[in-house]
Amino acid sequence: MPKDKLVITVSGLAGSGTTTLSKKIAEHYGLKHVYAGLIFRQMAKEKGMSLEEFQKYAELHPEIDREVDRRQIEAAKEGNVVIEGRLAGWMVKNADLKIWLDAPIRVRAERVAKREGISVEEAFMKIAEREMQNRKRYLNLYGIDINDLSIYDLIINTSKWSPEGVFAIVKAAIDHLDPVGDAGSKKEKEVG
């Protein structure tokens, strides 16, 4: 069984299932769920911008990303939390378990289209543009290549399992965590 003050990060690209998994983990283990995407969306709404507009705005205003990151790091210090966000694994230095979810872009586009009520083609284009913008922004701001998965403890292609199947895999990993494991040591570079 995992240690007290458990900290888990769940990262992945749009439509990979990070929110679904994070909610399941939080509910099952009684953890708080901190969602970087929601923080980002709330900030966009506060500025009266669409997500796409705010994405472009954030490229020119690094304080946006830094505020999202600061909130994630603060939540991790409190413990008993699942932190969901593309950079959560990079930002939370000593997470007990760092998870990356992936799926082919077509599968992710289908999921996003269903969730947002748009065509698969439109979702595909939005995802591709957003990922290009994010990758550039993370490289410029932190020197992080979002495609570098070397810091993650568990990488899952969510197109191969149902959400329940993905959770079962992650639950097994959490339930068998070594309480004196590496806690992310040596695997990651310093950020910010």
From Swiss-Prot:
It holds the Pfam family Cytidylate_kin2. It is found in: Cytoplasm. CDD domains: CMPK (cd02020). GO terms for cellular component: cytoplasm. The keyword NADP does not apply. SUPFAM superfamilies: P-loop containing nucleoside triphosphate hydrolases. Its EC number is 2.7.4.25. GO terms for biological process: pyrimidine nucleotide metabolic process. Keywords: ATP-binding, Cytoplasm, Kinase, Nucleotide-binding, Transferase. It catalyses: CMP + ATP = CDP + ADP; dCMP + ATP = dCDP + ADP. InterPro entries: Cyt_kin_arch, Cytidylate_kinase_dom, P-loop_NTPase. ATP binds at G12, L13, A14, G15, S16, G17, T18, T19, T20. The keyword Glycoprotein does not apply. GO terms for molecular function: ATP binding; CMP kinase activity; dCMP kinase activity. Belongs to the cytidylate kinase family. Type 2 subfamily. This is Cytidylate kinase. The gene is cmk.
